[in-house]
A protein has these predicted regions:
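Catalytic core of membrane glycerolipid acyltransferases/transacylases, capturing the structured
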Residues: 1-43, 51
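Non-catalytic C-terminal accessory region of glycerolipid acyltransferases
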Residues: 47-157
């Protein structure tokens, strides 16, 4: 996905990527050049929330994978609340996107990226300190949009 955005040449993108990807010096250099910055998954990494909102304020488009991992079965998993917190704090539209792989082997299959209608800030505005319930509602809204894009109305690709 970072290569797709970079090759499009349309806009400036930043990506949230798992910190393990930054351990190899060459790969770290490469993905940083593509606009990636690390997140410590599973640790409630709040600094990534601040860095994400800073990137958005700088006029960059943020690409985040709210599930925190890729799907092994093609189904959309549970999203993390970080995506909701970033959405609430940034005050910008969220464009849901779903990546669909036609084959079982992701690296050897045709990929389709589907984009949904933007979720507008006024639809998710909750104030400066959203409650856990509000964050769950925002996350559910965004993940529901992604699920519909990936799995369709009947729950399949």
């Amino acid at each position: 996905p970072p290569l797709l955005a970079v090759t499009s040449g349309c806009a400036k993108f930043s990506f949230v990527a798992k910190e393990e990807l930054f351990r190899n010096p060459f790969f770290c250099w490469l993905i940083r050049r593509l606009g990636a910055f690390p997140v410590a998954r599973g640790k409630g990494d709040l600094k990534v929330i601040d860095e994400s909102t800073d990137k958005i304020k700088q006029g960059r488009n943020l690409v985040i994978f709210p599930e925190g991992t890729r799907s092994k079965d093609g189904k959309v998993g549970r999203g993390k609340t970080g995506v909701a917190l970033i959405a609430a704090k940034s005050g910008v539209p969220v464009v849901p996107a779903g990546i669909v792989f036609e084959g079982k082997l992701h690296f050897r299959s045709r990929i389709t990226i589907k984009y949904g209608k933007p979720v507008m800030p006024e639809e998710i505005h909750v104030g400066d300190e959203p409650s856990p319930h509000e964050l769950k509602e925002i996350k559910s809204r965004i993940m529901g949009e992604i699920k519909e894009l990936v799995e369709g109305e009947d729950g399949r690709n």
